[in-house]
Structures are given as C-alpha cells and as structure tokens.
Amino acid sequence: MCKKNILSNIKKKKINLLNFNLKKMINFFIKIGEKKFRAIQITDWIYKKQNIKFDQMSNLNFFLKKKLNNIAVIKIPKCIKKIKSIDGTIKWKFLCNKEFIETIYIPEKKRATLCISSQVGCQLKCNFCATGQLGYKRNLLVSEIIGQIWYVINKIKKYNSKKKNFPPIKNIVMMGMGEPLLNLKNIIIAIDIILGNYGFNFSKNKVTLSTSGIVPAINKIAGKIDISLAVSLHASNNTIRNKIMPINKIYNIQLLLESIKNYLKKSSANKGIVTIEYVMLSKINDFQHHAIELSNLLKNIPCKINLIPWNPIKNSSYICSSSKNIINFANFLRKKGFIVIIRKNRGSDIQAACGQLIA
C-alpha cells in the first residue's frame, strides 16, 4: 500500500499511538514516510517526559507536528472520579469508550503499588468477587491498560510538585477488573511497554500478572513473558474450586499446577517463585484439613502463599474467616515450610479492596 493510501485511511479515524509498543511505533512512522528515530522521540515524550501533546514536543519539526495532529492522537482514558480511603488507598474511576473501569493506588511508606484492570468486567464469574458478578463487557485496549499507569504516575508527580507526600509507584499488579490472560494479545504489548527501557522501565520483579488459571495461556506465555506470576487458587480441592470458581470445571487444579511448573521452569522473575492467592471464606475453605490439602498440593512448587481475608460484596452470603482461623491456617502452612503472608485489608471502605471492583 502506498504512503498516500495509508495516510488517507488513517485520516478516517485518528490512530491512538498509546496502543503501540516501540516496534509498532517504528512501523507506524516508517509507513507515514518518517525515519524510525521519530518513534524513539515520541516514546521518550510519552513515557519519560510525560507529555502527550504533539505541539509541545520541541524536537519535532512543524510539518511533522501538523501531520501527526491530522492522523494521530495520544489519548488516555478519562478520569471521572477519584475516591480516597481512610488508609490512604486511592481509587480512580475511568471512562473508556462509554464503559467504566477502576484503578487502585496503594501507598506504603516509601513506595506504592498500582493495581490495574485488563477488561471491562470479567467472564469468569467467581462467585465471591464483585467483578465476576458484573459480567463481561469487553477487553481493554493497550491504550486503556497503559493509560491507567500513565495517568496515575502523572498525577502523583503533580501532587508531589505541590509538596504532597505521595510515594512513587514501584510495583504494577494486574489484579484489577478482568482476567488478563483472556486479553492476551493486548496484555503482551502492554507488558512490553511497562518493562521496556523506552517505556515505563519497571523491573520484571516488580510487575505481577494475576490469573484465575487459564492453563493454555499460562503455557503460551511461558518463556515469552518473564514477570512475576500470581495464581488465584482459592481452594485446596476441585470440589470446592468448582463451586466458587467455574473456570475450574475447564482447567482443574492438577492442570493448573502443571502449567505453573512449566511457567516457573522458563522464568527468572521473582526468583522463580509463584504467588498463590487464597481467599479466606468461613466454613468453606478455612478448616485445618484444607490447610493440609493445600500443603500437599503445593509441596513441590516454589511458591509463597497470600492469604486474603474476604472483602464483603453485595448479594453474597459468604463470610470472611475469623482472624483466629486465618492466623491458625497461616501458622500451619508456615510449619510446613511455606512463606505465608496475610494480606492487609486496604481500601475496603471505598470498595477498592480485592474482589470489590465493580466500577
């Protein structure tokens, strides 16, 4: 296709450059008759200088600025609401093409974690999760995934320029709305931008993808994406997992554990350790025999276990395990040699905690 036809096609709908990693950005600039170094300049402006306005990019000439303004845009999701928890957690609500998503900023003393969404809603229907109750609407575009990070980083810098003390984002977790591995194509591109020197330049050890267990996708990314992996297990046997996580009827625990082993063989992120997530549900999965089953399941898998006190959601009959039961569960696993963390409850007063996102 000649350059003229490409430009005429592009004019019909402006292309959002935030959907491109560096490779795709280079291809775009070559197709419109520009040198590939222009792609490096643009990504530098977007991610290093936090500027998305072509007219303010001082190393672009007048004619290139005019061309880009005619055919392209750098567009992030529109933030329509910000809510702050009593514990400092912040929830941002974004408008993405008439749909809503949520992003969570979780500050500690010297660093913060950003929890981002990958889909509008979720099709997995885990019955202890508000997002699962919402149902699935669509996958997020790369620009909508990356835009969450760009927006919050930009906001934190602005807050701190006014002498407000917001710790910088050091960790990215894909634990927001949706199942990342069911939006695999866009997630792969987004991860490239998150890790790339040209992009946000996060360490692979500081980026975590959380999955409910899409076994073929875990096997597919093994050796191709080297970031920390977290797996939402939430049960010690198939009977319980079938009831609370319908995906288990397709990919059961045994298949899931094999895919985890395969991933870890090909990953060096997080020292080759997977994070196992386990929501604590009273009288469902929190008895000692469940802890025994869990320890037997995981004895040959390098892992740390996150025990997650269940956060209340509407239209659910579940009850969170008592603090005593959670501590006893954790101590049993620790005696078996596991690293166990009881996750802190952050942002539950603004429905920003694990399992509460519903936009």
Swiss-Prot record:
<dbReference type="Pfam" id="PF04055">
    <property type="entry name" value="Radical_SAM"/>
</dbReference>
<feature type="binding site">
    <location>
        <position position="126"/>
    </location>
    <ligand>
        <name>[4Fe-4S] cluster</name>
    </ligand>
</feature>
<feature type="binding site">
    <location>
        <position position="129"/>
    </location>
    <ligand>
        <name>[4Fe-4S] cluster</name>
    </ligand>
</feature>
<keyword id="KW-0411">Iron-sulfur</keyword>
<feature type="binding site">
    <location>
        <begin position="178"/>
        <end position="179"/>
    </location>
    <ligand>
        <name>S-adenosyl-L-methionine</name>
    </ligand>
</feature>
<dbReference type="GO" id="GO:0030488">
    <property type="term" value="P:tRNA methylation"/>
</dbReference>
<keyword id="KW-0819">tRNA processing</keyword>
<keyword id="KW-0963">Cytoplasm</keyword>
<feature type="domain" description="Radical SAM core">
    <location>
        <begin position="108"/>
        <end position="351"/>
    </location>
</feature>
<keyword id="KW-0698">rRNA processing</keyword>
<dbReference type="InterPro" id="IPR040072">
    <property type="entry name" value="Methyltransferase_A"/>
</dbReference>
<dbReference type="GO" id="GO:0005737">
    <property type="term" value="C:cytoplasm"/>
</dbReference>
<dbReference type="GO" id="GO:0070475">
    <property type="term" value="P:rRNA base methylation"/>
</dbReference>
<feature type="disulfide bond" description="(transient)">
    <location>
        <begin position="115"/>
        <end position="354"/>
    </location>
</feature>
<dbReference type="InterPro" id="IPR048641">
    <property type="entry name" value="RlmN_N"/>
</dbReference>
<dbReference type="GO" id="GO:0051539">
    <property type="term" value="F:4 iron, 4 sulfur cluster binding"/>
</dbReference>
<keyword id="KW-0479">Metal-binding</keyword>
<feature type="active site" description="Proton acceptor">
    <location>
        <position position="102"/>
    </location>
</feature>
<feature type="binding site">
    <location>
        <begin position="232"/>
        <end position="234"/>
    </location>
    <ligand>
        <name>S-adenosyl-L-methionine</name>
    </ligand>
</feature>
<keyword id="KW-0408">Iron</keyword>
<dbReference type="GO" id="GO:0002935">
    <property type="term" value="F:tRNA (adenine(37)-C2)-methyltransferase activity"/>
</dbReference>
<feature type="binding site">
    <location>
        <position position="122"/>
    </location>
    <ligand>
        <name>[4Fe-4S] cluster</name>
    </ligand>
</feature>
<keyword id="KW-0949">S-adenosyl-L-methionine</keyword>
<feature type="binding site">
    <location>
        <position position="311"/>
    </location>
    <ligand>
        <name>S-adenosyl-L-methionine</name>
    </ligand>
</feature>
<dbReference type="InterPro" id="IPR004383">
    <property type="entry name" value="rRNA_lsu_MTrfase_RlmN/Cfr"/>
</dbReference>
<protein>
    <recommendedName>
        <fullName>Dual-specificity RNA methyltransferase RlmN</fullName>
        <ecNumber>2.1.1.192</ecNumber>
    </recommendedName>
</protein>
<comment type="similarity">
    <text>Belongs to the radical SAM superfamily. RlmN family.</text>
</comment>
<dbReference type="GO" id="GO:0000049">
    <property type="term" value="F:tRNA binding"/>
</dbReference>
<keyword id="KW-0808">Transferase</keyword>
<keyword id="KW-1015">Disulfide bond</keyword>
<keyword id="KW-0004">4Fe-4S</keyword>
<dbReference type="InterPro" id="IPR007197">
    <property type="entry name" value="rSAM"/>
</dbReference>
<dbReference type="InterPro" id="IPR027492">
    <property type="entry name" value="RNA_MTrfase_RlmN"/>
</dbReference>
<feature type="active site" description="S-methylcysteine intermediate">
    <location>
        <position position="354"/>
    </location>
</feature>
<dbReference type="GO" id="GO:0046872">
    <property type="term" value="F:metal ion binding"/>
</dbReference>
<dbReference type="GO" id="GO:0070040">
    <property type="term" value="F:rRNA (adenine(2503)-C2-)-methyltransferase activity"/>
</dbReference>
<feature type="binding site">
    <location>
        <position position="210"/>
    </location>
    <ligand>
        <name>S-adenosyl-L-methionine</name>
    </ligand>
</feature>
<keyword id="KW-0489">Methyltransferase</keyword>
<dbReference type="InterPro" id="IPR013785">
    <property type="entry name" value="Aldolase_TIM"/>
</dbReference>
<comment type="function">
    <text>Specifically methylates position 2 of adenine 2503 in 23S rRNA and position 2 of adenine 37 in tRNAs. m2A2503 modification seems to play a crucial role in the proofreading step occurring at the peptidyl transferase center and thus would serve to optimize ribosomal fidelity.</text>
</comment>
<dbReference type="GO" id="GO:0019843">
    <property type="term" value="F:rRNA binding"/>
</dbReference>
<dbReference type="Pfam" id="PF21016">
    <property type="entry name" value="RlmN_N"/>
</dbReference>
